[in-house]
Amino acid sequence: MLLGGRTAYLSVLGLITAYAAFTIWYTLTAQLHNPCVYATVSIDSKDGIAAKWEVYNSTIVYAYPENGAKRFSDGLSGFDYVCRENWVNESKLDVLKNMKELHDKVRIVVGTRNCRAYLWSVQLQMITGAWLIYIAFLCLRQERRLLGPFRNQNEFLSPTGYTFNYATYTLATTVLKTHYTKFALLLCEASLRRVALSRTFKRDPIGFLCEHSAALALIGLEVGTHFVARLLVVGTVTLVHTPCSQIYPIYLKLASWGFVVAVTIVEIVAIIYEKPPKTGSSANPPTPATHGVKGLCTSCCSTVLANLCGKLVYLLLVIGAVSILLHYEQRIQIGLLGESFSS
């Protein structure tokens, strides 16, 4: 279904896939001596407002705040607890304040971030969300290119490429040993109506959308999914501005910026570029179908089998993808980060 998409949109999907693979590779192979960063204040500080984020320093003595872990500012990963090992208990702060040789080396920690967990639990989930929502956008746009209205009629795709049409034709030819074309003829009629609606849409888009609420809802859903996917893509650049940016190498930050800039450029090109008209594209109606009892049986069987086959394939793909994701994601997560307290 996605093979009929615009080259620009498929390129964006490819960029998201490549960046997801790069993020997984770095998360699994990064040799971080200590994956944590800490928001610290001096031992004499009365509050945590002036906290400063810094990487782990073996010469520093880290201590809990006086009112315990409730003041902690943890990230979204759920694995920041691993950063709170071998700290001085808050009950010992009074003793440390009176030790001149340790006074300047004590830091009160008011926040922690597990930077490896951030990549896995936040950054990668954001990329995955963008990938899934972008696929949803491509599917919605594909359906509109097959059957829906467009102001630019060069966006049209031939309805003969519709999945159920192909499945119906294949089943009728291979299983029933006959030619079934009524579904194709129905799609051709829908194509003619699409052309008429598109002319009205081009002439008066606002009036058309006000008159056709279903078209407004579907086009709004398509635009909304595209917008959300763009937001998630741009949101991945927050990696550069998080406290963890101190611990990440420069090439990871450049990759994050390069990914967002590349997707933005491709999206701008897709907006500016006007799809040229297709040359020599003509859809001839297929040969008439067989009439009578045989034609009726062929029609019913082909339609039912095509729908069942299509739904079964989609269901198996979804179940398989979700099963693989849950199985391996849990194993890798536990191997990398350990058990989460929030799970």
Swiss-Prot record:
Briefly, what is this protein's role?
Glycoprotein that probably modulates membrane fusion events during secondary envelopment of cytoplasmic capsids that bud into specific trans-Golgi network (TGN)-derived membranes.
Query: What's the protein called, per UniProt?
Result: Envelope glycoprotein K
Q: Does the UniProt entry include the keyword Kinase?
A: no
Q: What is its main location?
A: host cell
> Which lineage do the record's taxonomy fields give for this organism?
Viruses, Duplodnaviria, Heunggongvirae, Peploviricota, Herviviricetes
Assembly, in brief, is: Interacts (via UL20 interaction region) with protein UL20 homolog (via N-terminus); this interaction probably plays a role in the coordinate transport of protein UL20 homolog and gK to the trans-Golgi network (TGN), and is required for the cell surface expression of gK.
Pfam families (UniProt xref): Fusion_gly_K
Protein species of origin: Equine herpesvirus 1 (strain Ab4p)
Cleavable signal peptide: 1-31
Is Calcium among the key words of this record? no
* Domain of life of the source: Viruses
